[in-house]
């Protein structure tokens, strides 16, 4: 189910996992370099060229911000996987982050590259694979996530 984080429903956030620094730093530097090159190029162009450059630089800055955000929230009751943004009525002009909520007892496993999560009941037609952005988590965060899920599943039994 896609939802927004609500402490009353999901409990407190115990920890968050973001992308690995080995992914964040080069990606951020690439976007910063592209922004700098565009700005320098625009300085030698006509004034009207500043508008598309400003849009492109704004996009690059937003991507730098996004690459630093958490991709998974581990809460007391469920695992929340980052999905994107929605425009909610009453939220003004600011989008609200949306999460895929998955119960710990429904998680069966992950693909070997952590690009997919298998959920459901291990019966015929009872499993589903969901694409998840866990490929760029650090190895320690991946292990911590798997250990916590196994711990929660052990307590639920």
Task: Label the model's feature ranges.
Residues 1-13, 81-89, 93-94, 113, ...:
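A composition-biased, non-transmembrane "mature-region" signal
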Residues 1-41:
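N-terminal membrane-targeting/pre-transmembrane regions
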Residues 25-26, 39-55:
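Hydrophobic alpha-helical transmembrane segments
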Residues 31-34, 49-64:
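Canonical hydrophobic alpha-helical transmembrane segment
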Residues 36-44, 63-66:
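Short hydrophobic alpha-helical membrane-anchoring segments
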Residues 60-101:
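Conserved beta-hairpin
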Residues 87-127:
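Acidic, Ser/Thr-rich low-complexity segments on the non-lumenal side of membrane proteins
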Residues 118-157:
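A membrane-cytosol interface segment of integral membrane proteins
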């Amino acid at each position: 189910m896609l939802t927004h984080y609500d402490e009353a429903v999901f409990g407190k956030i115990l920890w968050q996992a973001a992308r690995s620094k080995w992914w964040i730093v080069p990606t951020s530097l690439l976007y910063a370099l592209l922004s700098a090159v565009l700005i320098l190029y625009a300085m030698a162009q006509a004034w009207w060229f500043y508008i598309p450059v400003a849009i492109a630089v704004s996009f690059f800055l937003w991507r730098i911000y996004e690459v630093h955000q958490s991709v998974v929230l581990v809460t007391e009751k469920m695992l929340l996987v980052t999905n994107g943004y929605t425009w909610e009525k009453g939220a003004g002009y600011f989008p609200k982050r949306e999460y895929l909520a998955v119960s710990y007892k429904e998680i069966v496993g992950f693909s070997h590259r952590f690009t997919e999560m298998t959920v459901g009941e291990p019966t015929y037609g009872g499993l589903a694979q969901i694409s998840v952005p866990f490929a760029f988590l650090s190895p320690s965060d991946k292990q911590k996530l798997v250990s916590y899920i196994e711990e929660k599943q052990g307590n639920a039994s």
